[in-house]
């Protein structure tokens, strides 16, 4: 089973940022340190990142992108439809992956059980082995530091990379602005 990964999404005023580390781990071995686990969807209008099984995540990305196309890029309608499809399909219910999807208006976590969760604060979401470290750091920095969104995500992921053995500090970021 692939452990690893920290993905952090942040939605601010007119900006969305997603970041992820680059470490891929199998058991107690680091297989790769510069993997890309984030991407843009729907012609660059949606940011997405995954944690969990890579093969499962690519299946989820493909399925979600088809739904986005069908819903003309409406993120809210797409995550609801995605959840419905996930729960109907027995194969999908066994996938071992989670995703964060966001734009400048919405941010969601899509769980491995087909749940759609909008963060309580509507701003910050984290998944993966270092997710709680990144989430804690991001909340503290958001509340007490005057950082731009991109720097906040990067610094939070660096903190997670220093604490979580399945996360490194080879960070990649994607940004979306209104």
Curated annotation (Swiss-Prot):
It is found in: Cytoplasm. It is an enzyme of class 3 (hydrolase). InterPro entries: ATP-dep_Prtase_HsIV_su (IPR022281), Ntn_hydrolases_N (IPR029055), Proteasome_sua/b (IPR001353), Proteasome_suB-type (IPR023333). SUPFAM superfamilies: N-terminal nucleophile aminohydrolases (Ntn hydrolases). Allosterically activated by HslU binding. One of its GO terms (biological process) is proteolysis involved in protein catabolic process. Its main location: cytoplasm. The active site is at 5. Its EC number is 3.4.25.2. GO terms for molecular function: metal ion binding; threonine-type endopeptidase activity. It catalyses: ATP-dependent cleavage of peptide bonds with broad specificity. Keywords: Allosteric enzyme, Cytoplasm, Hydrolase, Metal-binding, Protease, Sodium, Threonine protease. Na(+) binds at residues 161, 164, 167. GO terms for cellular component: HslUV protease complex; proteasome core complex. Protease subunit of a proteasome-like degradation complex believed to be a general protein degrading machinery. Belongs to the peptidase T1B family. HslV subfamily. NCBIfam families: ATP_dep_HslV (TIGR03692), PRK05456.1 (NF003964). A double ring-shaped homohexamer of HslV is capped on each side by a ring-shaped HslU homohexamer. The assembly of the HslU/HslV complex is dependent on binding of ATP. This is ATP-dependent protease subunit HslV.
